[in-house]
Amino acid sequence: MSDRKNMKLFALNSNQEIAQKIAQAVGVPLGKLSSRQFSDGEIQVNIEESVRGYDVYIIQSTSFPVNNHLMELLIMVDACVRASAHSINVVLPYFGYARQDRIACPREPLTAKLVANMLVKAGVDRILTLDLHAVQVQGFFDIPVDNLFTVPLFAKHYCDKGLLGSDVVVVSPKNSGVKRARSLAEYLDAPIAIIDYPQDDATRNEGYIIGDVEGKKAILIDDILNTGRTFSEASKIVEREGATEIYAVSSHGLFVEGAAELLDNTNIKEILVTDSVATKEKTPKNVCYITASELIGDAIVRIHERKPVSPLFAYNKKK
């Protein structure tokens, strides 16, 4: 077993709360650093203890303000490189820019690949992240990437609440999220349904359901909850089609301005999200947070001890 004395964890400014929980799960205190922003917007990071020869883990979600948090991360990585860290591992509970993972129209940038290149060029040796928007983003990096899944966490939550079986239906509010919905449905032994829209429905007012939600408890699942519009529209559709109760779950709760008000005006009973993102905006009254810190902490320990991370990808239900 590798000695955790060779490991150091550092938290930047995006999500101090989850960083503290991750440190507790790993059993290693957070290292000392200072990070400040000058009046002109420049960021300065100072590591206040030696990292020479250590395996360094830097915890930072690149959430709002995305560019500040990304730049702070890059500066910290450079500081670790120049301070002779043995390895630099970046822990991204939420990876901003991952949605820009394809060229959808002419002359459009591939920004997820650009950010990957920046991190690798800065000196990152490994990425540990949580529920990438698209798993193929892993291929944008020329270094190892461990992409942890939140569905097992959600499955445990719903199983503990008794939300499983044929009385439940897992609904993907868009056709691109079918795989995610199917994964949760398999844990819950529940059917799935998909909300789709006609190709010419620019205002998204004519959504229809593929599958059956009538008389069932519907669980809407998406990876990123940003404005709340997707869940708001989907909740109206499943309610119209006869769902008896509506739940919503998302890996990353960004909750931009106005999202809480929009979601508070729906009949969604509970909105379940992880603590991957710390937001200063108002959150919905019925939001429920579950922590991903133990999952991430377990992954860090396994990486450091040269053990496989794959056992963390599943939740074993009690028979």
Swiss-Prot record:
Claim: Cell membrane is one of the keywords in the record: no
Pathway assigned in UniProt: Metabolic intermediate biosynthesis; 5-phospho-alpha-D-ribose 1-diphosphate biosynthesis; 5-phospho-alpha-D-ribose 1-diphosphate from D-ribose 5-phosphate (route I): step 1/1
Q: Which SUPFAM superfamilies match?
A: PRTase-like
Report the EC number(s), separated by commas if there are several: 2.7.6.1
Sorted keywords for this record are: ATP-binding, Cytoplasm, Kinase, Magnesium, Metal-binding, Nucleotide biosynthesis, Nucleotide-binding, Transferase
- Cofactor(s) needed: Mg(2+)
Q: How is the cofactor bound?
A: Binds 1 Mg(2+) ion per subunit.
- Gene3D superfamilies reported for this sequence: 3.40.50.2020
**What's a Gene Ontology MF term here?**
ribose phosphate diphosphokinase activity
- Assembly and partners? Homohexamer.
Q: What is this protein's function per UniProt?
A: Involved in the biosynthesis of the central metabolite phospho-alpha-D-ribosyl-1-pyrophosphate (PRPP) via the transfer of pyrophosphoryl group from ATP to 1-hydroxyl of ribose-5-phosphate (Rib-5-P).
Question: Can you say what this protein is called?
Answer: Putative ribose-phosphate pyrophosphokinase 2
The record lists the organism as: Streptococcus pneumoniae serotype 4 (strain ATCC BAA-334 / TIGR4)
